Structures are given as structure tokens and as C-alpha cells.
A protein has these predicted regions:
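Terminal-tail/helix-coil boundary detector
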Residues: 99-126, 130, 145-149, 159, ...
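Aromatic-lined glycan-binding groove of carbohydrate-active enzymes
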Residues: 61-100, 134
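Conserved, mostly hydrophobic/aromatic
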Residues: 2, 22, 50, 69, ...
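Generic structural signal for well-ordered alpha-helices
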Residues: 7-11, 32-36, 66, 121, ...
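Active-site-adjacent beta-strand anchor residues
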Residues: 25-26, 80, 133, 152-155
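Glycine/proline-rich, positively charged
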Residues: 1-60, 64
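Glycine-rich beta-alpha junction loops
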Residues: 28, 54-58, 80-87, 142, ...
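Helix C-cap/helix->beta junction micro-motif
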Residues: 16-17, 72, 131
Length: 216
């Protein structure tokens, strides 16, 4: 669907009081910038926030989404801080998924659980234990220390999970701490595929050319 149609519909809802603001989620950076320019030309409401998945195991938003949000003064609310539970220590092996876990559903969820990601989660857990913290709180704290982050969306299933995650706000990481995380997964790289905006991947949004379409 053309972005002008989407923005026109959002403008209708905003002007009639059905919504207060408009934002986007998991958009490629270029699509968000395109929408901002269309909103300028047409006097439509502008996106105020982008909501992508982001964790230590997939840092690719640092290449374009983060600088875009900084340049255009957009909020950045990230989700999946525990990388589908990998950073919480839920998985012990790439081919051994707990019953009821998302990875046990196979498909893309299983592909996101990698041996490298599990190894990194174990290192994070060891560092957290040495500092009197939990791996989950430390993983969220790491995100809160990154540039441009407005908020982190969490999904606790129990009150105990919530209390643990909220402890992240009390953790202060030093430059040496942050440098240590960078040795595990360098800035802008990934070890687990959670957010791929390549336009020619098999599940690319409708309307974007694939490599094969382009070749024809």
C-alpha cells in the first residue's frame, strides 16, 4: 500500500480524535524518512516514534535506525530485549528447545536461536552473577545505556519476571562494561537474525522489488 494512503488514513483518525499520535514499527529507515517527507508535503501527521526489535544479539538498527531517529528527533522504543529469551538463559543448545517456547514452534523462531547467541548469553550470565545481578536485568540495562533509546518494551509473564526486569533501571554500566559488550557483538552487527530490512528477502513487504524481479 502506498504510504500516502496510510498517512491519509492516519490523518483522518487523528483529526477526529480517535488517536493522539502516529508512529511506526519495524520500518526500514528509508521508509520512515519517506513517510516524514510525504507528511511534510501533504500536511499529514508525522511519525513520532519508531519501534524496532533490539538486543545485544542483533545490533543492526545502530547502522541506520538509531542515527535516523537522532537526525529526525524521533523516539525509539525497542522491543525483544532478551532476544526471544536467549539472553534470559532459556535455551541451552541450538537444537534443544523447551516445551512451550517460541523456538519449539520452529520456522523463524527456531532460526533465531543460534549456538553463538547461546554462548554469548552464558557469558552475559556469568558477568551478571559476578556483579550481583541477573542476566535479564543486565541485558535490558545494556539497551538503556545505548544512544537515542526512549524506552524498552518488556513482556514479563509473572510478577517476579517484572521485578527482575525493573532492576535494570538501577544498573549503571561503565565505559569498560560497554566496551566488554562490544567485544561480544560489535556495534552494528548481529549473531541472531531478528530484524532484517533487506528488500529482496523472501518475506519482504509487498511492493518492494526482489533481486529476481529486478533482474527481469
Amino acid at each position: 500500500m502506498p504510504q500516502e494512503e496510510t498517512l491519509s488514513a492516519l490523518d483522518y483518525l487523528l483529526n477526529r480524535g480517535y488517536i493522539r499520535h502516529v508512529a511506526c514499527s519495524t520500518h526500514p529507515a528509508w521508509r520512515t524518512v519517506e513517510a516524514l517527507h510525504i507528511a511534510d508535503r501533504k500536511n499529514y501527521p508525522k511519525f513520532i516514534c519508531e519501534q524496532p526489535p533490539y538486543s545485544l544479539l542483533d545490533r543492526r538498527i545502530e547502522n541506520d535506525i538509531v542515527p535516523m531517529c537522532q537526525a529526525y528527533d524521533l523516539g525509539l522504543m525497542t522491543w525483544s530485549p532478551l532476544a526471544q529469551g536467549v539472553l534470559a538463559g532459556r535455551y541451552q543448545a541450538q537444537d534443544a528447545f523447551p516445551d512451550g517456547s517460541r523456538a519449539s514452534q520452529k520456522s523463524i523462531y527456531a532460526e533465531r536461536v543460534t549456538d553463538r547467541g547461546i554462548h554469548i548469553s552464558q557469558l552475559v550470565s556469568e558477568r551478571a552473577l559476578a556483579g550481583g545481578q541477573t542476566a535479564t536485568a543486565l541485558a535490558v540495562a545494556w539497551i538503556l545505556h545505548q544512544p537515542a533509546i526512549s524506552s524498552v518494551i518488556i513482556g514479563p509473564r509473572t510478577p517476579a519476571h517484572l521485578e527482575d526486569l525493573l532492576r535494570a533501571d538501577d544498573i549503571r554500566l561503565s565505559p569498560d562494561d560497554l566496551a566488554w559488550f562490544d567485544t561480544l557483538v560489535p556495534p552494528g552487527t548481529f549473531v541472531s537474525d531478528h530484524f532484517n530490512t533487506a528488500g529482496w528477502r523472501p518475506d519482504a513487504p509487498d511492493g518492494l522489488l526482489t533481486r529476481w524481479d529486478d533482474a527481469e
